[in-house]
Amino acid sequence: ALARRKTGAVVIFSAGFAEGGAEGLAQQEEIARIAQAAGMVIEGPNCLGSINYLDRVPLTFVDTDISAEQAAFNRAQPNIAFLSQSGAMMAVVARSLADRALPLSFAVSTGNEAASTIEDYLEYALQEPSTRVLALFAESFRHPQRLLAAARRAQELGKLMVLLHPGKS
């Protein structure tokens, strides 16, 4: 229905897809097929959403308070984009950074990555001029060559890239 309405982007918070077995995997693959055919960006499923600290847009149910002053501060400072395949890590690390008055640009929970991957979000975050640090929490990469290209681009732009690769959970 959303594809027929030409919806450009969707956040799917719900779990029970690929991580839930064969039936869930089939449903997730169908979502990916629809998204690709419609040119739709999908965050998730099985994610906690994302927070754009620069434009004060929290697309999440995680408690966040971004005042106009905080957004202006974040935009004026060299800041951090935190991209995570784990929703819990996204919420905890973003809150911890904010509590320490470290400026953030984005905090993203990619979830199962049915149609948009951590590499997509990394490439987007690289384009934000005020973002100076790209911090990633990732168990796997669907497009390792794109990751390496993004790392080279970050180096060219003088941006730091930090990766925590925890392995299997």
PLM features: residue spans?
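Catalytic-core regions of core metabolic enzymes
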Residues: A1-S169
